[in-house]
Structures are given as C-alpha cells and as structure tokens.
Amino acid sequence: MKYLLPSTAAGLLLLAAQPTMAANTGGYATTDGGNVAGAVNKTARSMQDIIDIIEEAKLDSKGKKVKGGAYPLIITYNGNEDALIKAAENNICGQWSKDARGVEIKEFTKGVTIIGTNGSSANFGIWLTKSSDVIIRNMRFGYMPGGAQDGDAIRIDNTPNVWIDHNEIFAKNFECQGTKDGDTTFESAIDIKKASTNVTVSYNYIHGIKKVGLSGFSSSDTGRDLTYHHNIYDDVNARLPLQRGGQVHAYNNLYTGITSSGLNVRQKGIALIERNWFENAKNPVTSRYDGSNFGTWELRNNNIMSPADFAKYNITWDKDTKAYVNAEDWKSTGTFASVPYSYSPVSPQCVKDKLANYAGVNKNLAVLTAANCN
C-alpha cells in the first residue's frame, strides 16, 4: 500500500516559519543547529553551492581555518534535481556502480541547519563526520547513486546532537543481480554510527528503501541514544533500524509494507516501542542475524496488543538461519529506562489516520498533536 502524502501550498518554505525553539525535538537531540546568535544565512542552488558555503564557513576573515568552524550556518537549499532522480528511476540497476554524490560536513561543530524549500529535490546525500549540532529539514532525497561507495542519503558518523526532521527519502525496494549477495541497488536512508548519539529522527517519509538505517557500525559501536518518532516507513525491506546496542525510543511511527524485518534489536540493545501502527509487516520486532547477544524491547500501547491481532493487521513471522528472537508472543522482554525528555504521543489510530498529513516535505514543518486527532 502506498501512502500518498498531501502537500500544502507550494512555494518557498520561509525560515521565519520555523519554530523558535528548534531544540524541542521530541527526542534525545537538543540542538538548535545553526539557528543561534551569530548565524550566517546562505542560499544554495546546488550540491556544490552547499559544499562551498560550508568550506567558506571554516575560515575566518583572513582566510585562516578555524577549528570547528568560524560561524554557525543556516543554508536554504532551493535546487531541483528531479531530472536526475527520474533518470535514476528509469535505470535502477545502473545506479550502484556510479560515483556517489554528497555533501560532507566534516569537523564542523559551530552549528548548521540545512533546510529545503518546498519543491526542491536532491539526488545527492548529506554525510556528517566528526561534527555536531546539525539539523536537516524539508529535504527530498531520491534514488542516491553510488551504492558501491556507501552512497547513503544521510550518514552520521562520530557526530552527536543531530535532528533529521520532515524529509522524504525514497528509492526502489528491489534487488539487482551483480554481487555475491545479489544486492546492487541502493544504500541506506539514514545510518547513525561510530559513536554518534543524541539523534532525533522525526516526521520523515521513507519509502521504497531496502536498507533503511543502521544504529551502530559494529558489535563494539554500541553506546548511543536515538529517538525515531512520527515517521512513515512504506514498502521497505529492513533496518528500522538495525540496532547494535544502545537505546532506541520509537513512538508514533507508521510501519507498513515491511518485506523482511522491522526493528531489529541486537547486541544487548533495548528499544521502547510505543504507540506505533504496524500493518502488512514481516518480523516487525525481532533480534536476528547475530545468533547471540540478543537485544530486548518494551512494547507499550501499540495497535497490536497480542498475537490475536496479527491476522487483522497482516503481521507474519519467519525463522532465521541462526538463533533468533521474534516478538511472536508480543510481550516485552526488557524494561526501558526513563526517557529524559518531554513528549506527547498520540494514539496509534491517530498515527494511522492523520500522520500522512504531517510527515515528509512540503508540510511547513507542521506537527501532529492530540488536537488534530479528532
């Protein structure tokens, strides 16, 4: 089932329309990005413009490099790469071997916000390395090239305090032959790894993605706190996320059309899975592929309350070749520590009925509250 997300009026998404308290992310992130005193506002029409703006912000007035950046940035992106996205859509199996395209934000800790205008689009990714205090909003990422070069849409490495909000990320949930595992399609939508923590992923529309996202790079990269809320995952294969250790709070998400596995809690991680809507999903909550060091979960007030609901919502399960744990009894296997931030989740039914009006791009950053559920 495809969720058709309605749009608000087209045109520029004005910075003046942004909430004044960007730090209220509804999750572990507490960043204002570049929305702080002393910020410089720039407009970018292309990927290269964004690269140039960020590199310029690393230098002082005398052209000397400043550690962590010279000033905070607010970058408004108004480019349109629909033609590249359409060409990639018409040549899915040719994208893997192409050069990856992306903006790398490296060693920039002064704060940066990248926000797309309504109607903008990108056939390139944004990759964060050893930075902090970054916000990415209202960006539409489609059919990233360069899967063989780790061409993620959003990659967060060694970067704490990040907010990924109101974006659309899409490709084709499809396998092309060509490698030993027959996986020559696209890389991840959002990978969060290498000691990155305090990240909030909210109000994104992610569809047609095979490998949605990592939480952790390896069995030793396990210490992080992440929140996923009010996201729509539609026609996706797996990794919602693939969680290696740490803590994940997933609330008010809509999971539909999961073709392999959903929240995969591994390496003794724990997930609080709260007031979500699951439908047409295979292995929506599981711990698999490791064979040991299983993670645990606390299931709280989702639309599924017991195995008696599986048939109603078309929830199915299968086995793994290694030892595994599925939530086939739909019982909690752990207790999540108290959540250190305030949040106001709506009912799963409201998520099902209303979230499409708020998640994704061109929504002027609107949020879903209980008042909108009636």
UniProtKB/Swiss-Prot annotation:
Subcellular location: Secreted
Entry GO MF terms: metal ion binding; pectate lyase activity
SUPFAM superfamilies noted in UniProt: Pectin lyase-like
Disulphide connectivity of cysteines: C93-C176, C350-C373
Domain of life, per lineage: Bacteria
Binding note for cofactor: Binds 1 Ca(2+) ion per subunit.
Residues annotated as catalytic: R239
Pathway(s) this gene product operates in, as recorded in its UniProt entry: Glycan metabolism; pectin degradation; 2-dehydro-3-deoxy-D-gluconate from pectin: step 2/5
Position of the signal peptide: 1-22
Gene Ontology process terms (BP): pectin catabolic process
Known cofactor(s): Ca(2+)
Residues at which Ca(2+) binds: D150, D152, E187, D191
Predominant localisation class: secreted
EC number: 4.2.2.2
Enzyme class: lyase
A Gene Ontology term for the protein's cellular component: extracellular region
PANTHER family: PECTATE LYASE 18-RELATED, PECTATE LYASE 21-RELATED
Function: Involved in maceration and soft-rotting of plant tissue.
Protein's name in the database: Pectate lyase 3
